[in-house]
């Protein structure tokens, strides 16, 4: 079951100077305005309201902020809202001095063309990016003239999912200044009746919270209002800064007189199912744990802490075993064992003894665990009425044994055969999360990212609590034949205690008098059937009597749930099936105005008397990279101010770097000797060279050579450079093509194209790519692999020279020992000795003898330039130059590195 969804919301309004004033008469005296208390840089946020309407778990949220520019000059106002990753934005409007600029949801490719046109003019800002574990941030900024007012209004919707027996609305509040009218107003309507309602804040004492907070519930209605006065917002009695900086949480649950509840409005129905009081079904759990070398240290210790805590929660009727995989696969016991006190004590000793070693043979580890569960069932080693679960934890990609993701998926799918679920826990960012998610989804489970933080052990244990208490297995939701259309998922492997199954659909005949639903499942003691029958007229009339709820909420809930499930199915679909799923999800997204991974919201806003276009896309899990973010997204963009040269990527101190720039000059830093080696490669324009290839991580970098506009036929005087680079990840099914004009990114969702005129950050699971306008591009694959591409621009009308690229490897410590290529072969430690330094043919460039790789070479002292910090002049780097295309230094000869194309 999916975890409870936190309705997260951060309000952060930031103000900054956007213009330095207005031209006017030299005799005009400008008096300083008296600014209201709490105003920041002349911008007063005088009203912020979060209006939440929750109807039958479906939340409709409107965030409205009003600000005025009290300064004498134009100012830039930014509006930031953090919303749940599970939410869909449905509307955004910007109102300036009474003129409203709305947002429009369009197909992503249609919006992209509008976006790219604006990017080419250097005018755009992407609006949505990931923010932490559960949230993504919506940001928009606008210039506001002196004395003018601006209103921002954002609407988003989501289905709240039950987690550990309650629904949670989690609001992270951060206005960053005193706000005259600040209010959170939440209305909850639940036809089943509300059984409990609570609210608390992390940033304010209970005494102050009590006077600012009102909460009440009676019957079907609940209300929470948080309305602090200016004095209650102050961080101290005489302070002008706000203490509203933290978490505000609303929790509630509903009455459950029967296990199921059906609601019908306007021809759509929703069926909630959450039985209580059932005995727990015994479970058979195999923990498949990655103990490869990358788990060394804190990660492994936190994993062991979590496993010890999980062992405390095991019931005696449960069965368990541990599978450890690195280069090899080992097991704690030959077969599953019962969770008796004696066995649990032995299990604790085993967990404490776990140590890291070797590489990552994920395929064999999983297959061993699956085989063990199958054998236990076949040999009747576990109770007949029990359920099996595989829980796998890994922090990296498979790089030993079978490492092809598609083959691993096939092996696991065939081995499980739909008999039990697989849950995948991805530890950190240096892994292919999309693969783990696809692997889990097609085996009736789900994936969860475990963030590398101090609470990682709590995250692991928290996941286990979600699946610790299965009450039913093989759950089927059945409805009258020919009576329903467009049904969402109605078959589930498990129902877990404290969760809820939600099914929605459309009635084929709205004139029917009654509606009946059966839920069938296997319990701990027997097979169960729960029947719910409702009178359509009575049900619809009862729901419509509440005027304040939005009447089409069940239809929108159905659309939300359908889109969510179509997108999940799409991840493992291929060919025509994937096209059909995409078309269905896109049609619904456009019809119901949802910003999903297939659509974008385009906002046109006024800037300097011109319309500026901005685009909001749905990020993916991705995020997963701590900035990143939702696994559906083709790309994610976030606006950043133009970066100066000082903002270029700076590697950690002591990190060796390798690069190729200029004509093209290859420079290899050898930090152990505080020295560098360099060589040139002379080849015809159009030649593609292999720079990096790592079969373990799946990363490849190739570069294509270009010449001057007017090339010399004489190779001695010919100037060549890199004009195009291809960066690819086989494991992520991702390609990046960099030219001197644009950057193109392909992944499984499609193609995204950006301009060197843009300043933008693009993230998806395992990737972070930042383009700094007209300067450089920084590409990181998780933690430990970072490349920088430098753009060298010349006068476009120069008669000879043209723009070219430099390529720098500033972090390679996660690349494997099998990495090769003209640059990649030097990522591994190597040694050289220089002796017999003597005058060369040029007085300032002495020659010497170098012994490297058991070869003796004649080298010349020279210098090249590092352009990372200064793209124009560069920084001089002294190096020993190896002649003849690096002969004797590189493995083989340079022509061995010529490849047919970029990818």
UniProtKB/Swiss-Prot annotation:
Domain of life: Eukaryota
Family matches, as InterPro entries: ITI_HC_C, ITIH, VIT, VWF_A, vWFA_dom_sf
Modified residues (Aspartate 1-(chondroitin 4-sulfate)-ester): 663
Post-translational modification: Heavy chains are linked to bikunin via chondroitin 4-sulfate esterified to the alpha-carboxyl of the C-terminal aspartate after propeptide cleavage.
Glycosylation sites: 91, 580
Subcellular location: Secreted
Predominant subcellular localization, coarse grouping: secreted
Protein name according to UniProt: Inter-alpha-trypsin inhibitor heavy chain H3
Endoplasmic reticulum is among the record's keywords: no
Cysteines joined through disulfide linkages: none
